[in-house]
């Protein structure tokens, strides 16, 4: 909501079809149906929303999008614990949660707060993925959350194609992460 960029990541320049019935048809890229607030906001406009306005926008996206039959619904969220998380958890039946974080102290601190909230809401945390795509050393850490018993699913390593946000690139390093997630679920 506040910093939408899925449209940029997937190089989507068109807007979704907003039918007269106010149904939002996702845009498909690489066999992925995508909805982003970036489709609805001008690229230089901020969403200065809070409370009811924020929750209303999230509810509208969730409830008005024509998803079809999904195996998974991935929601890209910044680390946190605020209204946006609570609205999503109230609108959807969330079965599992995967954290994606970098290894810097600020990201770990934010993620620990998210973990605390998820534990309070009794939401199953499958594990975490360490995001190192901007770290050219490609050194991953063993476990960022040993006290929370949250297992590492893998590391997104620096890769020129990922760094340039090439949506057509199928990163072979991600196969191990996908296999781990499939085995857990």
Describe the function of each predicted region.
Residues 37-53, 57-87:
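Switch II (G3) loop of P-loop NTPases
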Residues 1-44, 55:
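Phosphate-binding loop that captures ATP/GTP phosphates
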Residues 27-28, 64-68, 90-93, 105, ...:
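Conserved catalytic network of the ASCE P-loop NTPase/AAA+ motor domain
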Residues 6, 35, 58, 76, ...:
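Residue-level signature of catalytic and energy-coupling elements of molecular machines
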Residues 1-3, 40-42, 79-80, 103-107, ...:
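Conserved nucleotide-binding/hydrolysis micro-motifs of P-loop NTPases
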Residues 68-81, 93-114:
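Conserved Switch II/interswitch segment of TRAFAC-class P-loop GTPases
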Residues 36-37, 98-102, 128-131:
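Conserved beta-strand segments of the P-loop GTPase G domain that flank and frequently precede/overlap
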Residues 115-185:
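C-terminal lobe/tail of nucleotide-utilizing enzymes
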């Amino acid at each position: 909501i506040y910093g939408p960029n899925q449209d940029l990541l997937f190089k989507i320049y068109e807007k979704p079809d907003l039918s007269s019935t106010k149904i939002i048809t996702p845009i498909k890229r690489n066999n992925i149906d995508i909805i982003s607030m970036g489709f609805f906001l001008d690229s230089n406009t901020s969403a200065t929303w809070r409370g009811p306005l924020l929750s209303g926008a999230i509810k509208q996206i969730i409830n008005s999008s024509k998803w079809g039959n999904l195996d998974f619904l991935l929601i890209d969220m910044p680390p946190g614990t605020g209204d946006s998380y609570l609205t999503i958890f109230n609108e959807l039946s969330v079965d599992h949660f995967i954290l994606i974080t970098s290894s810097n102290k600020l990201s770990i601190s934010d993620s620990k707060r998210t973990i605390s909230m998820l534990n309070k809401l009794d939401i199953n945390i499958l594990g975490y993925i360490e995001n190192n795509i901007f770290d050219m050393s490609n050194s991953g850490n063993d476990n960022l959350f040993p006290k929370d018993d949250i297992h590492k699913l893998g590391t997104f390593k620096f890769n020129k194609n990922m760094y340039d946000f090439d949506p057509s690139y199928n990163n072979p390093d991600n196969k191990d992460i996908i296999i781990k997630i499939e085995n857990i679920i």
